[in-house]
Amino acid sequence: MPDDSTAPKRILSGAQPTGQLHLGNYLGAVRNWVSEQRQYDSYFCVVDLHALTVPQEAAELRAATRRTAALYLACGIDPERSTVFVQSHVSAHTELTWLFNCLTPINWLERMIQFKEKAIKLGEEVGIGLFDYPVLQAADILLYEPHLVPVGEDQRQHLELTRDIARRFNDRYGESLRVPEMLIRKEGARVMSLQDGTSKMSKSDPSDLSRLNLLDAPEKLRDKIKRAKSDAVMGLKFDPARPECTNLLTIYQLLSGESPEAVEARFADAGFGRFKPILADLVIEYLRPIRERYDAIAGESGYLEGILREGALRASKVAGLTLERIRDRMGLLPPF
């Protein structure tokens, strides 16, 4: 491993270009990426290869990849400070996945809960790529030797596998790979569905009413909040027995910056008929700058392509050095 004791710690994260990025993605992840750019050497990837583990329409995948990258920038990721790139633009990801496949026991992958859950939904359509998804994820991470990987609770098991693969490689071939630490945040990490306060807001939820997409028009945001599941109890408070109420208050608290206590005091005597329009106004104004920046980025010919081209070059340089070291340790003859 290179000696980087004086360099800023490196952090890596990314999102699949499936569906649209929503408020839960922003509050749980992207907002933290933006605020931490000055602190870390940051790499942010659009993981399009992971999207292929389930059937995709080619034209929509290309459009969604561009949209996701543009949203990274619109949300405040600064390409002068951070490396923004598309996973498939760096070929080292797939090569290292194969090398790690030759190192990873099958029973490690058979324990992955997410594969079991998705395999049930897909039935006979499930492919090897979905089974191997965690190994590709390990390659994504270890190529850039990050010190920290922001991860939600639903990805904790996959990162543990990444750490196991790194340790196994180091045990077999000598200390070569940094074993990354998890960065798990509690606040804002679980914004819930607007239709079910016990389920996480998700891009894959079949109901578009369940989420507030970052690019939703103002009138659509207002309608979704108006139709969000709630209860008839007067007085709003954070209460596990009232998950939908808690979720809507959480969104308000995270966007307003007020403390939970202040939010409860403000709406102690309110019902949802009063609260929902206030929340809608807050969400609309909060997301307005993101939508405006997105429109500007999408309308500037060649800008996004240039950012992704430069990002791929920077990412390839770092990933190539790691891959070269791994190939050497594993005994592969270098190309002439």
UniProtKB/Swiss-Prot annotation:
The keyword Cell membrane does not apply. A motif ('HIGH' region) lies at residues 17-25. It catalyses: tRNA(Trp) + L-tryptophan + ATP = L-tryptophyl-tRNA(Trp) + AMP + diphosphate + H(+). A motif ('KMSKS' region) lies at residues 200-204. One of its GO terms (cellular component) is cytoplasm. Its EC number is 6.1.1.2. ATP binds at residues 16-18, 24-25, 152-154, 191, 200-204. HAMAP family: Trp_tRNA_synth_B (MF_00140_B). This is Tryptophan--tRNA ligase. It comes from Gloeobacter violaceus (strain ATCC 29082 / PCC 7421). The lineage of its organism: Bacteria, Bacillati, Cyanobacteriota, Cyanophyceae, Gloeobacterales. The gene is trpS.
